[in-house]
């Protein structure tokens, strides 16, 4: 989720989780036929800030002998990036590795020293790992049991949702409850990344309702900086804050904000600019694994899914025009 996705799903004690397991997913399945646009907003709700920073958060340890020696920066092999759309900036190697690394524990260890040295991109991507793996790592046994229960329901999207959750389980398998991956940690890492200069992290904080500054001038300036950057991760991080939650705000981008279509347009623009919106990417996986919002076509990417299920035919032209406007301006350095 946060997203590249952000999310604010609450962590529950394992006992409570286990006791309500089947009924919870039964309700989710029953609601699967409701308006997808509203469900998309729910799945992408930004992370909530903690009431106060916890000084004794348990961070994933730098070295765990039982989990292998993965502390070096070269521990995750470089993976060839997918081709970006024409005119879009190529994704950084760290972003490509986040999307494609089969072991996110090893990936997190490989970029830890760079994050500790204050590199904004490394801190931001650590927050993405923590967000992606938080639900699994808080209770791996219960998570696996839920996955089996969902698959056993044999509903139209059961197989897709079970598959997405299995991808999360596989990639996050070496994280454990004692690592303390929760959404307080995600929020604190994103504050750290934003203060270090990460535009996607800064955008995610604005989308969560906890911007670095609370003035309308700051908000308008940040939206403008994201637009000029043409950074797909910044677009994706900002998208939840550009939907109906921004209705009525004054800014130079008001025509590109304040409606349900606006949120989708920002995310679709991120896809065009090079965000991994493929069927197995983190965006589609998080929608499906965390929110039960899954395509029945296992090969369908985010754009195909949205146009099929979330945008009425008469609204497609409006969204197309918004996306064109969002990606049309020339990229400028930040």
Would you name each region that the model predicts?
Residues 25-42:
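Hydrophobic membrane-insertion alpha-helices, especially the h-region
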Residues 244-298:
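Mature extracytoplasmic/lumenal regions of exported proteins
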Residues 276-334:
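Terminal, low-structured helical/coil segments at or just beyond the last alpha-helical repeat
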Residues 109, 188, 221, 265, ...:
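Primarily a tetratricopeptide repeat
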